[in-house]
Amino acid sequence: MKKWYLIAATLLLQMQSVPAIHNKSGNVKVCRKVISFTPPLRIPLILSGSFGELRPSHFHGGIDFKTDGKTGLPVYSIADGYVSKIFVSYGSGYMVHITHPNGYTSIYRHMIGFSPVIMNYTLNYQYRHQIDQCEITLKPNELRVRQGDQIGFSGNEGFSMGPHLHLDLYRTDNGDFVDPTPFFMSHFKDTRKPQATGIRLFPQHGTGIIGGRTDQVSFYPANGKIIKGWGWIGVGVKCHDYQDASYSQHGVRYVSLYVDGKLKCSTNMACFSRTENLMKSAWVENDFEKMYREPGNRMRIMKADPQRGLVFVNQERDYKCQLVLRDLYGNESKYNFVIRGRKQTVPQWKFSGNVLIHWNRINIISRPGVQVIIPKLMVPNDLSIHLQVHASTGLSDVYQLDNQPTLLLGSCELQIRLKHPVPQGDERKLYIASQSPMGWKSCGGIYRNGFIITKIEKLGTYKLMIDNTPPKISVLSMGAGSRLAFIVGDSGSGLRSYRGFVDGKFVLLHLRRQSNKMEYKLSEAQVKRGGIHKFELIAVDNVGNVSTYKNSFRW
C-alpha cells in the first residue's frame, strides 16, 4: 500500500510541474511566459467539440470549431512557426502540423486542401513517390509561416461527422496534448453551468456494500439523496458542459468530490499524453467519470487523497458528499447527497469469470489454439473475464476473450494457431479478424511457427481468416466532366495502396473517406487534351492481392 501512495504522490508532482494561468483575454501565462494565439478562422468561434470529451475508446485530443455548416473556409496559422509535418490521410484528410517557437505545436485536421505553397510541396512529394496518402516530415527552414498566414481550407475529410475544423495543441518537447480553449476564451461567451445527469456509487470488490448488495447503484443527482452503505465506496458522475451559442454537449473541465467538507478527489482535463489517451477505461465506466483512482489509473489529470478518493464508511453516521462541477469561466454547479453508514456484512469477492487478470503483473492466458500475453498495467484493477472457445470448421476456432468487448489501457499480444494447412505461400494472406457490429474486421498479423500473431487493444472476439480476393474496382467516370472516378474497396484485409496512370504517367487519385471514392481531375498540365488516352489503375490489399483495371477514354 505504501508503494501505491508513493506512485500517487509522484504523479501529483508531475501534474504540478508546468503551471499555467489563464484568463478571459485569451493570454495564457506558462512558466512566467505570456503566450497568445490568434484564431484559426475568421468567423465567430463556436465549439462543436471540447478538449478531453469522451470518445468510444479515447479522449478527444483537441477542440472542434463549427464552420457554419460549410467547407472551404480559409484556415490560418495561430502563430509564427514552420510547417513540421504534412499528412494526407484516410482518417484526418488534409492535415498540417506547425511548430511554434513558444514551445507548442498546432495541428489542423479534416481540411479539404492546403494553401498553394503547402499544396505544391505536398503534390511534388506525392508525384515523386507515386502515393496519395502520405506523411511528410519537414526541416525548420523549408516552409515557414507567420501568424495569420493561410495554411488550408476547412473541410469534412476523414473521420468527421460534419464540416468543422479540428485544432490540436501539443507541447513540442514531450508530445503532451494541451487544451487550446484557454487561448481563445475571449472569443466565446459562456454563462451556462455544467450539469450532472447521473451519479453512481461503486462498492469496492470484497470491501464495500450498498443497501445489502455489491452491485453498483445509480441515481439522478437530486440534492438530499440518501444511500445506505458500508465499507469502501467509490463515487462517479456523468456530466456535460455547454456554451451559450451552441447546443453541443462538452466535457467538464474541473470536477471535485468533497466528503464532510474535505476534498477527496479532483480532475482537471488540461492535458494528457498519447499513452494516457488510451486509459479512458481506467477512469470512465459507462460514461461515469470515477472520482477515485483505480490502482492502474496513471492519468495525471486526477489528484486524490491517500485513500485514492474512496469513501471509507466505517461509522453509523451520515457522510455528506458534494460533487462540484466547474468550467473555465467559473460557472459552477454543486450536487449534494448522503451515504448513510449502516453496518452490513460485506461478502467476499468471488470473480464471476474463468480468468482473473491482475493489474500489476504480466498475465499469460493460454487455451488450446490461443495465447494472450497482457503486460502489467493494462487493466485498471484486477479484472475477471469469461473466456470462451467456440468450435469452428474454419481456419481456427472462434475465441471470445470476454462476454463483452473490454478496452485495455494499451495493447497486448494475441496468438491464434492455424488449424488447417494452407497452400505454401498463402501464409502471408492469413490475418486475425475481430468481430464488430459491422462484421469481421482485419487486425493484421504475421505468421510464425503455425500461429498468426498481432497486437490488440481490447478483449473482444477473434478468429483467423484468409484473404485470397483482390480489391474490387468500380468505375464511376472515365473522362466525363473532366474527371476519372472510382470506388475501390477490399472487404478482407483492407486496401493498402493504389496508383493510377494515364498514358503511362502517374496521376494522383485522391481517396475520400466520406464517399469511399477516389478521383482525379484531368488537367492539361499533365494530360494532353484532344484524343484517346490509356488509363490503368492498380490496387493492392494488405496481404498483397492485386487488382488491375485498364481502359481507354477520350478527352
What are these regions (language model features)?
Residues D244-R253, G425-E427, G489-G504:
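Solvent-exposed loop/turn segments flanking beta-strands in beta-repeat/beta-sandwich domains
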